[in-house]
Curated annotation (Swiss-Prot):
Protein name: BTB/POZ domain-containing protein KCTD21
PANTHER family, per the entry: BTB_POZ DOMAIN-CONTAINING PROTEIN KCTD21, POTASSIUM CHANNEL TETRAMERIZATION DOMAIN-CONTAINING
Pathway: Protein modification; protein ubiquitination
Single biological process term from Gene Ontology: ubiquitin-dependent protein catabolic process
A Pfam family: KCTD11_21_C
CDD domains assigned to the protein according to its UniProt record, in alphabetical order: BTB_POZ_KCTD21
Residues covered by the BTB domain: 3-72
Cleaved signal peptide residues: none
Species the sequence originates in: Homo sapiens (Human)
Amino acid sequence: MSDPITLNVGGKLYTTSLATLTSFPDSMLGAMFSGKMPTKRDSQGNCFIDRDGKVFRYILNFLRTSHLDLPEDFQEMGLLRREADFYQVQPLIEALQEKEVELSKAEKNAMLNITLNQRVQTVHFTVREAPQIYSLSSSSMEVFNANIFSTSCLFLKLLGSKLFYCSNGNLSSITSHLQDPNHLTLDWVANVEGLPEEEYTKQNLKRLWVVPANKQINSFQVFVEEVLKIALSDGFCIDSSHPHALDFMNNKIIRLIRYR
């Protein structure tokens, strides 16, 4: 049995065998480790490859097993495909093509489920009436929560590109708030009467906007209308069994489906 070989791939170290690296002789790795191509070394004497080290684990596992094993929430398909092209592991390239066709079919049929919650709470704040003169005030504030689940990761990304939080006078995309590729939780408030703009920032109160309409979402009715526009344009339709179509705008749980 040959001695282990340690690779430095983009700063990540992997240890494997010569037999594994040459298991596909026509690949770039097969050529590198059969002496047909020169190899570079790092300062520790490890074989250095200036490529992405994170996804190389999936390439190495394929060399070991001839099977493509990816986690269910894998989000680096484009990167992995480019790396497979670089290493020229043809069976892996074909396996990735089959996987992408499978994912594409799964994306066509989809479900969208939205759970809405609303409450009213009192917010306390200070108001500057004159230089060095402040008064305490309070006002009722509507707080909204929406839990969104979709079997289509692409739709949630589309939705995330349309909705923005307003905080500290700036709009920021909600895509950074994705819990995972299939879940999104939104929390925001309506405009509060008499609340100074700086208090929204001080109390971490976010408002929600939809673009490109540049419309602030101050009620669930507006939220549902805007999400519905986006969903219908992406092929979704209202699930006739839940809720009843006549009561759609007033329901706290909304379900849409897509068949293609």
